[in-house]
Amino acid sequence: MANTPQSKKRARQLERRTAVNKARRSRIRTFLRKVEEAIASGNAEIAREALNSAQPELMRGVTKGVIHKNTAARKMSRLSARVKALATA
């Protein structure tokens, strides 16, 4: 339990930041899910568009500190490889 005024303020800030970061993470997951669904549908063009729209969201998450840059790079690399394989298949 926060007792001092400073710790009470910090608790309020933490609540706000948690809500914002949760929304950001959710938005990133939504974009990634759209790419996954596009890949599953087998349509290379839709998958490419979904990937192109997901990339800025991932990078924004990195900039805002929601996800680590290596995590974003790994996700983009794996999704790009799958979309590329879909296009060549």
UniProtKB/Swiss-Prot annotation:
Pfam hit, one: Ribosomal_S20p
GO BP term (any one): translation
Coiled-coil segments on the chain, per record: none
InterPro entries, A to Z: Ribosomal_bS20, Ribosomal_bS20_sf
Disordered: region residues: 1-25
Domain of life, source organism: Bacteria
Signal peptide: none
Keywords noted in UniProt: Ribonucleoprotein, Ribosomal protein, RNA-binding, rRNA-binding
One Gene Ontology cellular component: small ribosomal subunit
GO terms, molecular function: small ribosomal subunit rRNA binding; structural constituent of ribosome
Family designation: Belongs to the bacterial ribosomal protein bS20 family.
Role this protein plays: Binds directly to 16S ribosomal RNA.
Name the record gives this protein: Small ribosomal subunit protein bS20
Species this protein is from: Paracoccus denitrificans (strain Pd 1222)
Taxonomic classification: Bacteria, Pseudomonadati, Pseudomonadota, Alphaproteobacteria, Rhodobacterales
Gene from which the chain derives: rpsT
